Amino acid sequence: MTIRHLSETIINQIAAGEVIERPASVIKELVENAIDAGATRIEVVTAGGGKTLLRVTDNGSGIPADELALAVSRHCTSKLTDDVHDIRALGFRGEALPSIGSVSKLTLKSRPQDADSGFEVCVTGGHLDGPRPTALNRGTIVEVRDLFYATPARLKFMKTDRAEATAITDVVKRIGIAFPHIRFSLAGTDRTPFEMPATGTGAEATLERIGQVLGREFGENALAIDAERDGVRLAGFVGIPSFNRGNALHQFAYVNGRPVRDKQIFGALRGAYSDVIARDRHPVAVLFLTLDPALVDVNVHPAKADVRFRDPGLVRGLIVGAIKQALAQSGIRPATSGAEAMLQAFRAEGFGAQQSAPRPANSYSPASWRTAPPAPRSEWSPQTAHPAHRPLDLQAAPALRENGQAVLGDVAVPAADARASVAEAPVELMQKPLGAARAQIHENYIVAQTEDSLVIVDQHAAHERLVYEALKNALHARPIAGQMLLIPEIVDLPEEDAQRLAGHAETLARFGLGVEQFGPGAIAVRETPAMLGEMNVQQLIRDLADEIAEHDTADGLKAMLHHVAATMACHGSVRSGRRLKPEEMNALLRDMEATPGSGTCNHGRPTYIELKLTDIERLFGRR
């Protein structure tokens, strides 16, 4: 076969296969171009899920008539000169418009701010026509019709019109969160019109824009994040652990304003929530990373969806540390969705007939967010808490003992035969975040009263979290006990993996794992954590080597130890069906208030829900 040059049309179609995956990819490229042009108003119109029509209109700086032909030519751009490592624009390759034009019927109209009239060019299957004059307001209009008509095989891979329209909406929302000063609107024959009004600049404006996308409920269950380390800043908002979702569609990440779906960022997010939500649940988060463009490579993915950090360990550590700190400082806080679900259940049974229709979860107004109550009694913190109860001095349950020795010192476990009774709630206890215990129902749920709400606590789930946190603190307070192997286990590894693992020997020793290099391509394991019992040493070492190679951390072993602690806590905590005295119930409530993360159990389930008095009154038609 003869080697020959490909035609420009074929080259662009190949590029389109990388850049233009579906109609939403076209919208992403066109909206990013509009943002780079300084637009403050962007309108998107679609038809047929974007396969029939895509139109993006903006009021940006526009393109001069003599540059329109260049704009649809391959590798022509105004955003990049000679430094590919200092990229400050969303687009920079000069591939999008020619790639789109090679597989569709594209019309580009533009009028710069200082021009008397507009001009347009048309590209049909890669063939250019124009420029020629056209009537146009200042700004740019890009219209794409019959997407993939020139490559019909691609159409077979398209989803339904509704699915493609939904993907377009998701793209616009993701971009819109990072640019609250821009007004976005979507319309068309294949969708319900959607609009995001401009909210301005700054943190308050970003909050309002997030509310437009995620709804009022997120604002009521979000924690602010703001941290910086070695020139990398992390800002944004994350949901409390009990406010989670069944998929990761409500996770948004941005690097220097660019929306990305980087597995490293979302992996760090998952790691931060590893012991506070269930494995099959996902946190809700909006994260903004800001750093020197020279410290991140955005030119590693055709659609610029992934990035590569110069120091990935720094970024991961910043994300995990900042989120864990925010979760720890948030105190106890239930998700509003739990109480709402209970109220809905009452309404479904016919309660509260006079109740007005509840506000939809996704309804939003800036005023409602600003006036929404923050975390209940946010002035409270574990440091200022002073338990007003009789301390329980019982020993840890048998399940918390290992080899006859207590793994955890004293754990407050109420007596098995205690009987509950309704007592008059002291006023000072009702002022506490979780109030005063009034009763125990079904020998599993503690009913407490605050000044303005009713609190229902799952005693087993709550005590499970308390024991788990105490176990973790014990693990971190002193080195983990190890057990010597009669015969050291030799694990063969690639030489570079063995060297990296040996470099973390001191850290691993704190967790009871004794390793040392055994020749150029092997690791000798002489000691393993006693808590883990019998284990597959070979698999553990290989997993740790992979983790260190990817993240430069050895968190996997710590995660395993935490998992064992969680299992021990589950078996060693107060069981359902156990009767508690009022003072023991109050002791549990006070311990919850003093323990970060006590709003969820080790499996991610809520430990309590709170019903406001106003909601209860509505159920009975009093409001």
From Swiss-Prot:
Q: Which intervals of the chain are annotated as region Disordered? A: 353-389
Where on the tree of life does the source sit, at the highest rank? Bacteria
A Gene Ontology biological process annotation? mismatch repair
Gene3D superfamilies according to UniProt: 3.30.230.10, Histidine kinase-like ATPase, C-terminal domain, MutL, C-terminal domain, dimerisation subdomain, MutL, C-terminal domain, regulatory subdomain
Q: Locate the transmembrane regions by residue number.
A: none
Q: Which GO terms describe its cellular component?
A: mismatch repair complex
Which GO molecular function annotations are given, in alphabetical order?
Answer: ATP binding; ATP hydrolysis activity; ATP-dependent DNA damage sensor activity; mismatched DNA binding
Locate the compositionally biased regions of type Polar residues: 353-368
The answer on whether this UniProt entry bears the keyword DNA damage reads yes
Alphabetized, the UniProt keywords read:
DNA damage, DNA repair
**InterPro entries in UniProt:** DNA_mismatch_repair_CS, DNA_mismatch_repair_MutL, DNA_mismatch_S5_2-like, HATPase_C_sf, MutL/Mlh/PMS, MutL/Mlh/Pms-like, MutL_C, MutL_C_dimsub
- Outline what the protein does: This protein is involved in the repair of mismatches in DNA. It is required for dam-dependent methyl-directed DNA mismatch repair. May act as a 'molecular matchmaker', a protein that promotes the formation of a stable complex between two or more DNA-binding proteins in an ATP-dependent manner without itself being part of a final effector complex.
* Family, per entry: Belongs to the DNA mismatch repair MutL/HexB family.
The record's listing under HAMAP family reads: DNA_mis_repair
**UniProt xrefs under NCBIfam families:** mutl, PRK00095.2-4
Q: What is this protein called?
A: DNA mismatch repair protein MutL
Instruction: Name its species.
Output: Brucella abortus (strain 2308)
